[in-house]
Amino acid sequence: MEEEGIRNFKELRAKFQKFNAAPLPGPMRFPAGVSRKHDRGSTQPAQDLANRKCLSSHHHQTPSHSSTGVSQPLKNQTLKSAQGDELQKTSSSSGTPEKSTVCPERDFQKAAVPLDVTKSRAKTSNEEKGMTLSSFRYKLWNWEKVSSQNGEMSPAPLLTNGGIKTFHFEGQKTMGLAQDKPEKSLKATGAQTLPPQSHSMAQRKSPVTSKASSVSLPPHSRKSTKSPATEGSHRSSQCQPVYECELDSLVPEKPQSRHCRLPKTKPLPSIETLGPPPPKPSKPPFVNLYAFHRLPATVTKTPKEETMKEGPLSPDSAELEEAHNYDTTISYLRHSGNSINLCAEGESTEATYEIEIEELQKPWRSFFLPELSPRPKEEENTMEEKESWESEPLEPRKELHPSRPPKVVVYKETPGKTQMAGVHEDRRSVPAGNQEAMTDIMQNRLFPEDVTLTRHSQDKSGYVEALEVTKETPSPSTIRSSSSSEKTYDAVECSREDVRKWDFSSSFTSDSEENCEEMYEDIYKAKNDDPKTEVAGRTALRKLQQIFRKENVVFRMKKTKSKEIVSNGFSVSLPDLGPRSQDDSQDGIIYDDVDTREKESNDEDKVKTWKTKFLIPKGKKWGKGSQGSKSFSPRHFFRTKKQKLEKNRMEKEEKLFRERFQYGKEILVINRAVACASNSRNGMFDLPIIPGEQLEVIDTTEQNLVICRNSKGKYGYVLVEHLDFKHQG
């Protein structure tokens, strides 16, 4: 079978090479050994066969210029194969579906035999295909051109696996029937020659693809896109089951039918049929949601809601919360006078608690009565750092209460010279009796040695806290500016318990300004300016303890004798009390309230003026300076404030009276009267009166009206009949 196929292919190739226009031999017939199992064309009626012959003869009209030798065998060969193919497919479509589906499955298994034959043929023809294609393509191109003009025939390229192109022309219906069935069955025995194979391959090409390729592309560029396996299956036998529904779907669509299938546009209905448009809907009612926005701020949270994480707040609630926290922060800044609770208060600034006025007075009380337990050194440093930034927000609040009595701390470093450390407003407006009790507490309990309260020498209603400083020789390095003294005061304020720890007589000075906030042990070491006399820490502390004991003894003697001298009235200035030991003279201890003989006259005058008010007994003190003490009492403060308000209101009413009445005279009270009846006139210039109210007569008019002023300072006209002048004082 393979030798016969190869022999036929060689004949075809030799004829194309040698005789370019020579006709092909007659149609090749199948050998006797090949059985046609699926060919049932003999059972078809004669009428159906005649119709297909007419149709195939109509499609296969050859052009006039082609040679008769070539066209006649091709026509006969294609006609016979087309007839056989039509008969097979008609019989298969009329049969049962069960039998027809068995045929492609059985024939698909036999597709490998022609595929190998085709590959062997392609290998032998690759070497000689160049010369044979040129003349063949030219003739085929003329053939396709004529067929495309008639509109009844379409070309179909065929590409073998090796690259050989063979083209066959077939009718439109025959090719459409075999479009979607690539699996074809093979014959059981025998071999098939090249012209029937190429003819059967041409039948299975799509009409649309062949028509597009014939019009747009030249003949030499048309190539088959099918795979070798598909081509091998196309060269199989002619048995292929096709149903009637598939036959209808395989018929190519015409452009007219496609155009008719487009969706039809439906015109819009007219305005008359639709009628008038519907009325516009009314606006919704206005609803104020401001109350609902404020509601979450006041509603109390349940325990379950408190455990949940808080999401992003709305802008309104966020603003309310920030404002509330800001007020709370201010209130805690007021509450931060107690240095012991600074850390706890700094952490609780985000809380939303209200602080009452009584709680604001607690730091002032705790300042005079702090706990006597000593603090560790680490807590000291943290308190000092807290005090430094706490003092900044408290500074703008000093201007809010200018009438409060300030507290002044004074450091006596050289005899007769004082320096203001800073003014602080820890003291609130307290009655005179409470102030006296607090001074007693300070003198007896907290600061029994060196802290006393006095009035300022210039009588500016302030309190001076005098701290004693022991120095061997006064030097310029000990004199500090006001800024350095403020820092020193902050350090002293933060470490008052350390002052009690060292018996309240320690030195608060050092060689440099940086040492003012250091710990007291370092200050004690740096007490002497001479570096040669510096001693180790323990020995220095022992000496200081001895000095403090001597100071305590001398201070007690001084206190008792000063009371006796002042009570007897012998002298105002105190002499040098008691003999001092040699150690005291060497240390050069100088007391603030002791007048030494080594002072200059100017210093003596300053100290005397300061001591005259410091050493006055309590009874004489309040009797002599009662006016000054009244200014500190809250009753006197509110009384003066009320008087100022009344004065301002009177001035305002007077100004309004002059503008309204055009009164340019001096306002003088000429008489006083009591209203006996209510005023019946209710004009702009009339003064409303109440029976029994006392009025001051300012001026009279031409009519029976007088200008009066009531107790509130308002002016207006009053009838003379409504006034009674008998009760005047």
From Swiss-Prot:
Protein name as annotated: FYN-binding protein 2
Pfam families on file: hSH3 (PF14603)
Major localization class: membrane
Single GO BP term: T cell receptor signaling pathway
Subcellular location: Membrane raft
Biased amino acid composition, Acidic residues: 584-593
Annotated ranges, domain SH3: 668-728
Positions of post-translational Phosphotyrosine modification: 489, 591
Keyword Phosphoprotein carried by entry: yes
Gene behind the chain: Fyb2
PTM description: Phosphorylation is required for its function in T-cell activation.
Domain of life: Eukaryota
Biased composition regions of type Basic and acidic residues, renumbered to the chain: 374-402, 594-603
InterPro entries on file: FYB1/2-like, hSH3, SH3-like_dom_sf, SH3_domain
